[in-house]
Amino acid sequence: MKMYFNNENGERYEILTRVHNEVMLLQTMNGNYIVARWIMGDSWGAGHYWMNDRSGAWKDFFKLAYEASGENMDYNEFIEMFREV
């Protein structure tokens, strides 16, 4: 069953995976990926988050996100899509 996340602007994203209920990989309706991170209370901060420390939950998250995406690219290429520019 597909799950979706709607932001305050009414934009709809498909939830591809979640890790520890703290971070989600979302896919926009036009195919772009967004990482959303739980901020506080009941709000999600969506954006292209990049963590230089790829250990712990973030390492697990990107591994699961890569597997869930089904992208035909190598893992390092995949995580580069999330580097902040």
Regions found by a protein language model. Give the residues of each.
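A generic structural signal for ordered secondary structure
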Residues: 12, 29-36, 60, 78, ...
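Detector for Asparagine
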Residues: 6-9, 21, 30-32, 52, ...
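Intrinsically disordered, low-complexity regions of eukaryotic proteins
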Residues: 13-16, 24, 55, 76
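Mixed-charge, Lys/Arg-enriched low-complexity segments
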Residues: 43-85
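Compositionally biased, intrinsically disordered low-complexity segments
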Residues: 18, 26, 82-85
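Short aromatic-glycine-(Arg/Gly/Cys) micro-motifs in beta-strand/loop hairpins
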Residues: 20-48, 64
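Negatively charged, low-complexity tracts enriched in Asp/Glu with abundant Ser/Thr
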Residues: 1-18
